[in-house]
Regions:
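Flexible, solvent-exposed coil segments and beta strand-coil junctions
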Residues: 17, 61-65
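Alpha-helical transmembrane segments of multi-pass membrane proteins
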Residues: 40-52
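Short, glycine/alanine-rich hydrophobic alpha-helices that insert into or span membranes
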Residues: 34-43, 85
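Interfacial helix-capping/hinge residues at the ends of transmembrane alpha-helices
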Residues: 86-88, 118
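Interfacial helix-start motif at the membrane-water boundary
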Residues: 64-86
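Interfacial/capping segments of alpha-helical transmembrane domains
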Residues: 50-61
């Protein structure tokens, strides 16, 4: 009987020590989503010039409501997304709110990941912005985006940042506030959409630029949050979620890193 009990205990211990592998970060659903955004980008291209010309007509450019809305949501995307992500992280550290810290850190990571991908693509594509020549949405030249901001049109950095934040915050809501995820998603994605549309209004991007940017940002947010939550022992979380931020005696804040396992 003792031998049997020992065998059961040994088997239980071995089972406990054999952790189940984490689920895949990139799923079939993500593949379909990526393909959908690529298709949407291609479908948007025939309408690039038409929308650009419509947006620049006096009726739209002199509309105070459209102009003010575009300004607000353009700034919400840049620098707003960085301020929001970083602000949530710092506020979470100061108030010792793990959830707020988590959301701020992971949304900031998503913005960085999307921005890096966007920089690589726009630098290589070298697409001219509509303000360069509104009659030529097909003006691409490999590598030209490295030389001038006028040729960094494809994809939109504002759109990808706004959608990365929206996607990450919505994904985090599924872990922390599942009953409010739909509402949070509607608000954040709604704001991201208006941020994206501000770019054609400002004659800075074509329609297809913002569609691709939205796709990159959305995927970045989903993948970053999923990876972080299925790999909780990753070095980013160990370092930055273990960091403490507190008011310094002489003013300002004191920062200390406490890497955890």
């Amino acid at each position: 009987m003792t031998l049997a009990a020992a065998s059961v205990l040994a088997a239980s211990t071995a089972t406990a020590q054999t952790a189940a592998p984490p689920p895949p970060t990139f799923t079939a659903g993500d593949g379909w989503m990526a393909g959908g955004f690529v298709a949407a980008t291609l479908l948007a291209m025939p309408f690039d010039e038409r929308l650009a010309r419509w947006m620049q007509q006096p009726a739209q450019q002199n509309d105070a409501a459209m102009k003010n809305t575009a300004t607000v949501f353009r700034n919400l995307a840049d620098p707003g997304t960085v301020v929001i992500g970083g602000g949530l992280y710092i506020a979470g550290r100061l108030t010792h709110d793990r959830t707020m810290t988590d959301v701020g850190l992971h949304s900031s990571e998503a913005i960085v990941a999307a921005s890096v991908a966007g920089f690589v693509i726009k630098s290589a594509a070298g697409r001219a912005r509509p303000r360069v020549d509104i009659a030529n949405p097909h003006d691409y030249k490999f590598g030209r985006g490295l030389n001038s901001n006028d040729y960094e049109s494809f994809p939109s950095g504002h759109a990808l940042a706004a959608f990365a934040l929206a996607s990450a915050v919505t994904a985090e809501a599924g872990y922390h506030w599942a009953d409010k995820q739909t509402l949070i998603g509607a608000l954040t994605y709604g704001g991201a959409t208006l941020s994206a549309l501000s770019r054609p209004y400002n004659n800075a991007h074509w329609l297809s630029d913002v569609v691709l940017g939205a796709g990159i940002g959305t995927l970045a947010g989903r993948l970053v949050v999923r990876w972080q939550h299925t790999h909780p022992d990753n070095w980013v979380d160990r370092t930055f979620l273990g960091m403490s931020v507190a008011p310094a005696p002489g003013g300002g804040v004191a920062v200390a890193f406490h890497a955890t396992r």
